[in-house]
Amino acid sequence: LITDQPPLPPEAKTVHMYPGQGSQYVGMTADLVQRFTAPAQVWAQADETMIQVLGGETLSGFVLRSSLSKEELKEAEHKLKQTEYTQPAMLTADLAIERTLQAYGHAPDMVAGHSLGEYAALMSSGILDMDGALRAAAARGTEMGSVEIDDKGLMASVTAPYEAVAATLEATEGYVIAANKNSPK
């Protein structure tokens, strides 16, 4: 990595953290795949597994695409929002980034993941192999996508002091809760 910061002291530890579902987008890691071998190999390996799981489809066929028309982009984005695709695609992107870093000597001392990112942490640490993790993530996504609820509710991200949010929630009728209390305010 190129940085203008001083090097870390030898006793410093490095952690690689992996996100959960929600940070995906069409084209994620495409820039890495075009420049480096390691992420291209990860996507190729993922496609070998996912062709079996998705009935002949590949993840890279819609995730790594570029120069799309508006209609093609809309179609790819729609597919990527379906959890049975989202979860293995995010997992593959996480591992593609990880393997790129490792190819250049950047191995973590520790790993952590949020929700789906826990699978990536388990893969990175050697506990899960890629094939098994992808199959588990796809099954998890399929099950999540099959849940039918009459009122799916809504979610909002609010950047405000928690006290103000709590007061608003208390004054609101119906079932409204703060799921995460992680605003910088």
Where are these regions (language model features)?
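Conserved alpha/beta-domain cores
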Residues: 2-4, 177-178
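FabD-like malonyl-/acyl-CoA
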Residues: 4-171
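Short, surface-exposed beta-edge/turn micro-motifs
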Residues: 153, 184-185
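Gly/Ser-centered flexible loop/linker motifs
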Residues: 165-183
